[in-house]
């Protein structure tokens, strides 16, 4: 269920432990939503890129991971290889769903995987990820920038909300907490929009009792960092609320340090030889240029 849910949202969850991974110490994400053209553009900056494994050079596994990002449609969301959009994984998941349907192994209602396939195909057509450049930040650490463009935003959100309701109906998201289950069932009856995007504000609302919320094993440090960057995580009116951005803002910025560990300068040499490092790259100027160009294309 988790895989299906996150696939619909365009996000992969990777739970397998990784003893030798490419990591980044800080991420800055700036997004601008264009409601009239139903488009979202995102500027991604990853700073302090390095290999987590031992040694002064990247391991074969880390090199393979780096290659997969540069050659594929992948972008990350504040958790180093845990939350990401992976175009290759989405393609494979579509193939797996088609195989299930062909073999008659789709669970319960075949309409659900068919709808999911259609949504994922639309997502594939709607998203573009461009790897801009490797560069060195002010601390001399290996860093990189990406540009992401997502079209048909409202269709993706509508599909995600409908899919969440369908999962509640078939019992995939049942809660042990009795009152939370009541709230979930009522949200289906009321056709609650769990995910909304208004102006530059992204909001997620999930039915949950106050008791259930208090029992959640949430990393307080992560919440603190998220709120410091302007986000909100709270429980109110029978729901968990996660919110970032303001409706009338020009755009929304989320910048978080993901690690306080000592930086390992073990990736720059390989990247310089394999891909090149733009030592004159100015991320602030490049970001401004990206949004100017986006305004010209999508602002109406």
What residue ranges belong to the model's regions?
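N-terminal Sec/ER secretory leader and immediately downstream segment
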Residues: 24-116
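N-terminal Sec signal peptide cleavage junction
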Residues: 18-21
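Sparse, context-dependent recognition of short Cys/His-centered cofactor- or disulfide-binding micro-motifs
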Residues: 6, 25, 131
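Bacterial N-terminal signal peptides that target proteins for export
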Residues: 1-9
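Mature, soluble, non-transmembrane domains
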Residues: 79-300
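Gram-negative bacterial Sec-dependent N-terminal signal peptides
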Residues: 9-15
